[in-house]
Design a protein with these regions (language model features):
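N-terminal secretory/membrane targeting signals
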Residues: 1-27
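Hydrophobic transmembrane signal anchors and adjacent membrane-proximal interface regions, especially
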Residues: 11, 50-53, 126
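Transmembrane alpha-helix boundary/anchor motif
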Residues: 20, 61-64, 106-109
């Protein structure tokens, strides 16, 4: 009896493990709170749908062909000398080429439109924030207001925020998933990032680049 129960548990263990792991995930990228993140979500969904154009037919054909040409199906058409089909060649080459061309144009336009250093068009004066990554915290300086904070930033909603980012230690990745666009913080260099929050809230910020033992706790809060 115990052995039977053990086998039943082991049978569903992968499913249970998967559910537990996924329960700790958040679909932040699919629930954007800013202009840049909304445009990036559209790009992700478009690329995903184009991928399904290839993936779904392949999966269906694998299932259909396996069933149709199974050993027990004596009624299946048998063509041992088949070697070429112009129709098949046209499909397997044309569809991927069209998808690649579409993605190439989309990527080119999106890369320039979502360039992190490109200022956002707005009638509202942007907020300037200097960002310095340290071990294992974030230092934020407001040069216009003459104040500084650690692991917390606050800015007005619907107002562009111009980040000037560098590192006082090793390289890190500055990322507010709900607002979009990750960019590196590098020692001796300055990178720029322009974001805007479309609604009020407190958003999680992280270091998206592994930089050492304490990187998992290198988080901050961004409040709009």
């Amino acid at each position: 009896m115990r052995h039977h129960n053990y086998k039943a548990v082991m049978k569903y263990l992968p499913v249970i493990t998967g559910v537990l792991l996924l329960s700790g995930c958040q679909a932040v990228l699919l629930d954007p709170k800013g202009q840049i993140a909304i445009e990036q979500r559209a790009l992700i969904i478009t690329a995903f749908c184009l991928m399904l154009v290839v993936v779904i037919p392949v999966i269906l054909m694998a299932v259909i062909f396996s069933w149709k040409y199974r050993a027990s199906n004596t009624a299946a058409k048998y063509t041992p000398d088949w070697s070429h089909s112009n129709k098949v060649e046209a499909v397997v080459w044309t569809v991927p080429v069209l998808i690649i061309l579409f993605l190439a144009v989309l990527t080119w336009k999106s890369t320039h439109a979502l360039e992190p250093s490109r200022p956002l068009a707005s009638v509202v004066k942007p907020v300037e924030i200097e960002v310095i990554s340290l071990d294992w915290k974030w230092l934020f300086i407001y040069p216009q207001q003459g104040i500084a904070t650690v692991n917390e930033i606050v800015f007005p909603v619907n107002t562009p925020v111009n980040f000037r980012i560098t590192s006082g230690s090793v390289m890190n990745g500055f990322f507010i998933p709900a607002l979009g666009s990750q960019i590196y913080a590098m020692p001796g260099m300055q990178t720029r990032l322009h974001l805007i929050a479309g609604e009020t809230g407190t958003f999680d910020g992280i270091s998206s680049s592994y930089s050492g033992r304490g990187v998992s706790g290198m988080k901050f809060k961004a409040t709009a």
